[in-house]
A protein has these predicted regions:
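Loop-to-helix transition at the N-terminal end of transmembrane alpha-helices
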Residues: 44-63
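Juxtamembrane transmembrane-helix boundary signature
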Residues: 58-79, 110
Length: 456
């Protein structure tokens, strides 16, 4: 049955590999179950309701990805978009969280239309292969940087923006132990991968978590909520209280539009739409490139199904009570473990569904245990750099700017925007437009990106 649905042999994989890959993807994404409620509750939403909505929206989106596209990509409410939802739309602009959900819902409807009319697919195919390879590398650096941050290996600095963690004095017990455990986790995971241990990334997460538990039991690791270092020992395993979901479910349809200008509403909606569109395209490009899923023309077969899954999940998430649901770059961790079909994503989706019940257990997975997986995934995605034509400055410079922008701007969509603008203008100004056969859609995207920077 699984073979018939997911075509495992055709994709050179098996059930065990797909299950391990799906579990790995979930483990690297599980942090969203804790982070999303924390961020959205700042807007006045009930945290428990958001937790359940996050789990269900992730299940819906990821299961649809498995069934509609047969790809190993997982979806969940996107980081960055949730912060924009709470801190900008609600707290700064003064709109209700119900109206913010309506903006997300409308964005999802527009995406469904764009996916049905192949507009999103056309944008994907219009991006030149050099930039697609650069996006994959840029996402790798971005994911690794997120891992370093999650592990507290990189911290804020007033003088240099960021700096490495210091391992001396009281800092060791307050924050440093988690950072040290993350470094140990990177080494453990690397050894497992060098030894070609199947499921090495997943085992690396679990071993690092166990080491954290031992450190907490012996007093070496001291939980400190103010520093973002929580207990790694589960105090309970299950919860059957689902009543909180009623506080957010369907609230999107009770939006009060009085006093809200139509232009202001569409400005908010467009911001969600822009970031979601290019974050999703960037993730699909990057992870698909890593998995060798792109054909010789740089196109992704069955992309329409993947984009429909993403679009429907956004609408479903808004109805359930969460911000924009999007494809996660952490999907690359499952791909690195060998995941190649929808069985990987279905496994991840089922785990998100189970998280509704087992949330107390999943919420104790520490960030220092999943950080090594993200760092190692970053390494694996560097391979796409070999496909970039660095000997041609017209190709290499835009690719470099794309790679540079993603971790430094902390945004996949910004990296794509800078790459598209620089590639189009550089080839146009130097008279290479005819030679490179620049798509009309690339000109349109370039103009839209420039207008975005000028007007927004």
């Amino acid at each position: 049955m699984l073979e018939k649905i997911f075509h495992l042999k055709e994709n050179h994989t098996d059930v065990k590999t797909e299950l391990m890959a799906g579990i790995t993807t979930f483990m690297t994404m599980a942090y969203i179950l804790a982070v999303n409620p924390s961020i959205l509750s700042a807007s006045g939403m009930d945290a428990n309701a958001v937790l359940i909505a996050t789990s269900l929206a992730s299940f819906v989106g990821t299961a649809l990805m498995a069934l509609l596209a047969n790809y190993p990509f997982a979806l969940a409410p996107g980081m960055g978009l949730n912060a924009y939802f709470s801190y900008t739309v609600v707290l700064t602009m003064g709109y209700s969280w119900q109206l913010a959900l309506m903006a997300v819902f409308v964005e999802g409807i527009i995406f469904i239309v764009l996916s049905l009319t192949s507009v999103r697919e056309a944008i994907f195919n219009a991006i030149p292969m050099t930039l697609k390879s650069a996006v994959s590398v840029g996402i790798g650096l971005f994911v690794a940087f997120v891992g370093l941050q999650n592990a507290k290996l990189i911290v804020n600095s007033d003088s240099t923006l960021v700096t490495y963690q210091h391992f001396k004095g009281e800092t060791v017990h307050r924050i440093g132990v988690g950072a040290i455990l993350a470094l140990v986790g990177v080494l453990i995971t690397a050894v497992l991968l060098v030894k070609k241990v199947k499921g090495g990334i997943l085992y690396g997460i679990l071993i690092t978590w166990v080491l954290g538990i031992l450190c907490e039991l012996t007093g070496i690791y001291i939980p400190n909520a103010d520093a973002g270092m929580y207990s790694v020992i589960p105090t309970s395993f299950i919860s059957f209280d689902f009543s909180a979901l009623g506080k957010t479910f369907g609230q999107v349809f009770k939006t009060d539009f009085s006093g809200v200008g139509i232009l202001n509403f569409f400005a908010v909606m467009f911001s969600f739409l822009f970031v979601d569109l290019f974050d999703t395209l960037g993730t699909l490009i990057g992870v698909a490139s890593k998995a060798d899923m792109l054909d010789e023309d740089g196109k992704l077969p069955h992309i329409k199904g993947a984009l429909m899954a993403d679009s429907i999940a956004t609408c479903a998430g808004a109805v359930l009570g969460t911000s924009t649901t999007t494809t996660f770059v952490e999907s690359a961790s499952g791909v690195t473990e060998g995941g190649r079909t929808g069985l990987t994503s279905m496994t991840t989706g089922v785990l998100f569904l189970l998280a509704v019940v087992f949330s107390p257990l999943f919420l104790t997975i520490p960030s220092f245990a999943t950080a090594p997986a993200l760092i190692i995934v970053g390494f694996y995605m560097m391979g796409s750099a070999l496909k970039i034509e660095f000997d041609d400055p017209a190709e290499g410079i835009p690719a470099f700017l794309t790679i540079l922008a993603m971790p430094t701007a902390y945004s996949i969509s910004e990296g794509i925007a800078i790459g598209v603008i620089s590639w189009t203008l550089l080839n146009l100004i130097t008279g290479k437009a005819k030679e490179k056969k620049i798509s009309p859609l690339m000109y349109i995207l370039t103009v839209l990106f420039i207008l975005k920077y000028v007007l927004l």
